[in-house]
Amino acid sequence: MPPTYNKAFIPLESNPEVFNELISLLGAPPSLQFEDIFTLDDPALLPDKILALVLIFPTTPTFEARLTAEEAGAQDWMVEHNEEDEDAMWFKQTINNACGLYAILHALANGRAKDFLRPGSLLDNLLSITAPMDPAQAAMALEASTELENAYSSIAIKGETAAPSSAEDEVDFHYISFVKSPDTGHLYELDGDRKGPVDRGVPDEEQRVDLGQKSLDVVRQFIAQGGDNIGFSLMALVEKA
């Protein structure tokens, strides 16, 4: 059964320049930037410090079938909310076509990235408000934030492709994030359309802070499960010198 939403936004273009404009408004400094990743197979072409990955992919029948099967067994992978010991900050998506926004929020709210946020910035304040809340309350707080909606709307109309005529128009692409807990080394797949954060284990024992090669292998496996579809694209949130 497809998710139901309470409101709708114009979709965000998968463009690093657009993403970087938005994260600047949210409170990220210039030292945090998104950039395109064109290959996962050549380490020489990958950034040194990957704080998060955002994967954009088509919502094909193959993906929908796999999602349904995994959701049926959610008790095997879902991380329960624990206010006292939260290893991954996850937001339930309640805004249609805003998966790009949720991917950005997940990338910035987890791992080392959250330590870069400007104190008192839009996202820093939202994270302070939502941290003690359960997922349903946190989702409603994001949905009700006029400041967040205004920042997003000012950027979503930009990009190289024309925005849909209506925010309610459905799009066939979805965004998810992969982040690392610096405390435990666990890799999390964060998708606002799922029942909770997906714990993908500790792939990088030797690199427990940022995403290392074995974390990238998990993303490769996700892409491979899409079969012959070539509609995937990938962006990395990186720390610049």
Predicted features along the sequence, with ranges:
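Cysteine-dependent deubiquitinase/ubiquitin-like isopeptidase catalytic cores across multiple families
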Residues: 1-241
